Amino acid sequence: MFVYEKKLQYPVKIKNTNPRLASLIISQYGGPDGELGASLRYLSQRYSMPYPELKGLLTDIGTEELGHLEMIGTIVHQLTRNLSEEDIKTGGFDAYFVDHTAGIYPTAASGFPWNAASMAVKGDLIADLTEDLAAEQKARVTYDNILRLSDDPDVNDVIKFLRAREIVHFQRFGEAKRTRWRVTKRAAEQNSRKSSKMVACGCLTLKSMVMGAHPLTAIVFRFPQCGHPSSERSCHSVRQSKGRA
C-alpha cells in the first residue's frame, strides 16, 4: 500500500514559462527512458525477485521513480502555465497543444506516446538487473541532453538533482548484482565440487556437471533412467552411441 505525502522530493520553483523547453522535458515523463517506464519496470520486476532484499530495493527505487514522475510533471506544468497563443506558436508547442492543450500527457519529445514496449520484465535476476543498469544510464544521458539544451537555472537545478539520483540508482543496482552474483556463484561452485566425482551410469563413466545459464539460475539436468546429472544427452542416447562405436 502506498501512502502519499503532499510534497515533492525536491522543490520545483520555475519563474519563467518556456513551452519549447517543456516540449523537450516531457520526454522524461513518457519517453522511452522516462520516469513512468522506470517506475513500472521496477515495481513489476520485484515480484519475481528471489531475494527479499532485492524485492525491497526495487520497491524503494520504483516508488522513488513515481516521485520523479511527479517532479517532471510539475516542471512541464510550470513551464506552460498561462501561455498566450503567440507563446504557443513561437515556442514550438502548437503540435502538443492541439492534442493535449496544456495537460500533462506521457509522450516522448519526438511526439510518440508512452509505450510499454520501452520497458522489460524477464523474471530472471541477472537479466532484469542488467536491464535496470542500462535503463538508469539511458535516463542519465537524457538528463544530460536536457541540460545541454536548457538555459533556465531553475529548471537545471531540478534536472541536476534527478540526474544525480539516476547515478545513485545505477550504483545500487550494481551493488545488488555484484553481491548476489558472488554469493550464489560461491554456492554453485560448492555444489559443483560435490557433484564433480566420476560416476558410473551402467554403460559409461561420466563426469557429472551442473549446468545453467549462470550461477544464479543453475539447473541440474538428470538422466531419466539413472538419475545422474548430464549436460545435454540422456542415458539412453549415451548407450546407443556407445553401442554404435
Give residue ranges: language-model regions.
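Non-heme di-metal
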Residues: 1-224
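N-terminal low-complexity segments that are often proline-rich with Ser/Thr-Pro
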Residues: 214, 222-245
